[in-house]
Amino acid sequence: MADISALAEVCRKHGTLLAVDNAHGAYLRFLEPSCHPLDLGADLCCDSAHKTLPVLTGGAYLHISRAAPASLRESAKTAMAMFGSTSPSYLTLASLDLCNRYLADGYRDRLREMCGRLEEARKALTAAGWQVEPSDPLRLTVKAPAGMTGGQLANRLRESGVECEYADPDFLVLMLTPENRAADIERLVYAIGTNDAVYAPQPSQPLARGERVCSAREALFAPRETIPAAQSLGRVCGAPTVGCPPAIPIAVSGERIGPEALELFRRYGVEQVEVLR
């Protein structure tokens, strides 16, 4: 998790506002103490409630700090209207309202209990030989040891009826909610089992250095074709290419695809890319 308090201090020092994309952190307000960006000094914050709370897909909140300039609060609705739909989903809006009832009905206590269980699970996995990475309180992030991938760990869990949130060559990420039972945590720890493999230092993958051939706008409006990623060396990228969005693109529109990008395509399972004709 980012150090929002420090970022807010820097922003105040330089007289600028701090806006935070808190997509996966809507629940942070209910921790004790609160870890929500607005409570840590942010001026503006967007929470994708549907990611961590019982809200229909697309349901989100835009929060504006009471300490933010009045002009920000006054202009926010007009600014949102520039991009918002004129046909909103009232089902989604209703789910946000119903979520307020859910949050008021013992959610804070259930969240505290689940965070305690997860902390015990982290200790148990560490004792069993796994490297557990720092993460937000409702996530469990396990680094894959030498000779194993996060995907292989995910398959091991799937065989025991446990589905992960995300897996890549390096990590396995699991996400829980206050509605998970103690038995769910026990099954998770049992399914992962013990690890005897070593954690050898791994060199970080360098970011691909793309050569700019044209602007992103020119590339997006140019004729494009989809080709196997392995055959894209030297071609100009037509659409941003990532292993799992949202993420830092391996290649962006208008860049010539180089050997570093090709290696990252292979590593993160990107099989096809759009290139200019």
Predicted ranges, named:
Residues 126-253, 259-268:
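Conserved C-terminal alpha-helix-loop-beta "cap" of PLP-dependent enzymes
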Residues 272:
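Terminal helix/beta-alpha structural elements that buttress the NAD(P)+-binding lobe
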Residues 1-131, 144:
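Conserved PLP-enzyme active-site core in the AAT-like
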